[in-house]
């Protein structure tokens, strides 16, 4: 079984110590317009999102097939319930190749995306999130 650290997620995977990232693992997902590129950018975006969670309850976190890792959890952001599924795929060298982060339901996803745009205001990351009032 592969040992993994998902960019600072506070999950069982985080405590396993896997930190091998290529120069630009793209991060895509339902919250984002476009892809976030680069390990530092991905860490900032994921870390910023985690800071807004009031709570996080894991349903599953573990290997998915031969070259992937998946997390399924529910969280709460300012009282709004939100569900998430994160899929990380690895290349032949065992490094993260692609990260997909999807949230549900749509109303919570839109609320969370607007909060993240506010959080990242003045940074290059803000443009990836939904504009408008929270």
What do the PLM-derived regions correspond to, one by one?
Residues 1-134:
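C-terminal and inter-domain tail/linker signature
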